[in-house]
Amino acid sequence: MSVKHVSVLLLLLQLSCCFRTGSCGKVLVWPMDFSLWMNLNVILDELVRRGHEVIVLRNSASIFIDPSKQANIKFETFPIAATKDDLEDLFVHYVSTWTNARQNSQWKYFSLLQKLFSEYSDSCENACKEVVFNKTLMTKLQESRFDILLSDAIGPCGELLAELLKIPFVYSLRFTPGYTMEKYSGGLSVPPSYVPIILSDLSGKMTFMERVNNMLCMLYFDFWFQMFNKKRWDQFYSEVLGRPVTFSELVGKADMWLIRSYWDLEFPRPTLPNIQFVGGLHCKPAKPLPKEMEEFVQSSGEEGVVVFSLGSMVSNMTEERANLIASAFAQLPQKVIWRFDGQKPETLGPNTRIYDWIPQNDLLGHPKTKAFVTHGGANGIYEAIHHGIPMVGLPLFGEQPDNIAHMTAKGAAIRLNWKTMSSEDLLNALKTVINDPSYKENVMTLSSIHHDQPMKPLDRAVFWIEYVMRHKGAKHLRVAAHDLTWFQYHSLDVVGFLVSCAAFLIFLVIKSYLFVYQKLVKIGKKQKRD
C-alpha cells in the first residue's frame, strides 16, 4: 500500500472517531514539564488519534516538551527570559531541597516546603505573564476558537487563559499539597478522620495519634501553607481581567478534574461527579525488550531479575550511595537491571548491568521480573501494579512517601529510608519481597483491581474531555458548594438559627414557669392572709 493510501486511511479513521463522538474539537493545552508532561502527553496522543486538533503552549526553555519528537501535535512556543539550563538548575534545586528537607522535623520540613513553593509560584507567574501580555499570541489564540483547555492544576495560568478565551477547561493532576485546591476550589470532601492528607506520609489505617497528626497536617495546609502566593495571584488575575477576581474563584470554574490515581493506590473516600480518578492511564502491555537486554534477562534462569530506577526526575547520586546499593545487588542470586547515569560503582557485581535508560514498562511486564526498586513516583508505582510486581520503596520527595506508605499498608511493598539505609537493609528487603509469597499475592490483587474497570483509565479520561466539549462545559456536574460561603458550607448559619430557636424556646419555657410560679406564690400568700 502506498504512503498516499495509508494517509487517506488514517484520515478516514480519524473522521470515523469524529462521527462517533459528534465532532472533532480544538484543544488548547497549558502543560507542565518533566514527568507531568509525560502523563499529559499520553492523553494528547489519544485525543489526536481520535481526530482532535491539539495545540500545546510551551515556553522557549522547555526541557521535556520537544516539538521535534511529536509531529502529530502542534506547538505554540512563547519566549521567556530563562534558558533551558536555568530551568534544569532550578529543578535540580527543587528536588535537592525537597529531598534533604525530609530529614528535618515535620514542621521544619513544611516550613522549607513553603519557601520552595514560594519560589515556584514566582516562576509560574513570570511564565504566565509572558503569555497573557503577549498581544500577538493572545490574538492568535482568540481567533483559533478553541473548544476546551487542558492543564495541570499544579501549574497555574490555565484557568486564566480559559477565562480570557471564554472556553471550558479540564484539570489533569496527581495532587496539590494538602488537597487544598481540590477541597476549596473543587469541592472535594476530605474527612481527616479516615482520609490521609497528602504529604503526611500516612496510610488509610491510622492509629489515634496518626489521626491527630493527620488533623494537624490538614489545619496547617488549610490555614498557613500557601502553594501559591494567593494575594499576588488575585491581584494579577484581577489586573488581567479588569475586574476583582480571586485565584480560587477561577480554579473553581474547572468543569472536570482528572485525578491520576485510583482505588488500587488510594483508600476509599467521598468524591464528586466532576472528579474522575484515572490513575495508570499511561500503562500498557509490555513490548519485547532490545535483543541484548533480553539475552541478559533470559540468562537469569529461574531466579529472575530485579529492576531498579529512580525515574526521570532524579539523576544525581553520591558515589558512596551508589556503592552501597551496588554491594547489596551483588549479593542477590537474581540478575539486576539498574537505570543509572553516574560513574560505575566499584562494588558493582557481575549480576548487575547499568543503563542510561531502560524500557521500564516492558521490563516490569517481563515474566522473569521478580521485584522493582523504586523511588515511589506515581508512574512507576502504577506500572508495577499494572504488571503485578512487588516493590521496595526508596521515597525521595513529593508524594512519593505517601505512595510507598499506601503500598506498604496494602502489603505490596517494603519501605526503606534513602538517607539511612544500609546495604544489608536493601538486601534483606529485596529477599523478603521476592521470597515471601504474600507480597506477590497482594500486588496481584491490586493488579486485578486495576484491570477490572468498566473503562480503561485513558479511555475514561478522554471520554470526559470529549464530554465537556460536547456539552460546552459540565456545570451541571458541579456541586452547589461552589456558591456557598464557608459558614454556609458547614451549615453554621443553620446551626446558629436552630440554636437561637432552641434558646428562645427555653427562654419562653423559663419565663412561663417563672410567671406561673409567681402567680402561685401570690395566690398562696393571699390565702394565708385570708
UniProtKB/Swiss-Prot annotation:
Organism: Oryctolagus cuniculus (Rabbit)
Membrane topology: Single-pass membrane protein
Keywords: Endoplasmic reticulum, Glycoprotein, Glycosyltransferase, Membrane, Microsome, Signal, Transferase, Transmembrane, Transmembrane helix
Superkingdom of origin: Eukaryota
Primary location class: membrane
Family: Belongs to the UDP-glycosyltransferase family.
Top enzyme class: transferase
GO cellular component: endoplasmic reticulum membrane
Transmembrane residue ranges: 494-510
Role, per record: UDPGT is of major importance in the conjugation and subsequent elimination of potentially toxic xenobiotics and endogenous compounds.
Secretion signal, residue range per the UniProt entry: 1-24
Sites carrying sugar chains: N134, N316
Pfam family, one: UDPGT
Keyword Manganese: no
Single GO MF descriptor: glucuronosyltransferase activity
Catalytic reactions on record: glucuronate acceptor + UDP-alpha-D-glucuronate = acceptor beta-D-glucuronoside + UDP + H(+)
PANTHER family the UniProt entry points to: EG:EG0003.4 PROTEIN-RELATED (PTHR48043), UDP-GLUCURONOSYLTRANSFERASE 2B4 (PTHR48043:SF12)
InterPro entries associated with the record: UDP-glycosyltransferase, UDP_glucos_trans, UDP_glycos_trans_CS
Gene3D superfamilies tied to this protein: Glycogen Phosphorylase B
Intrachain S-S bonds: none
E.C. code: 2.4.1.17
Subcellular location: Microsome membrane; Endoplasmic reticulum membrane
Presence of keyword Cell membrane: no
CDD domains per the UniProt record, alphabetical: GT1_Gtf-like
Name of the protein: UDP-glucuronosyltransferase 2B14
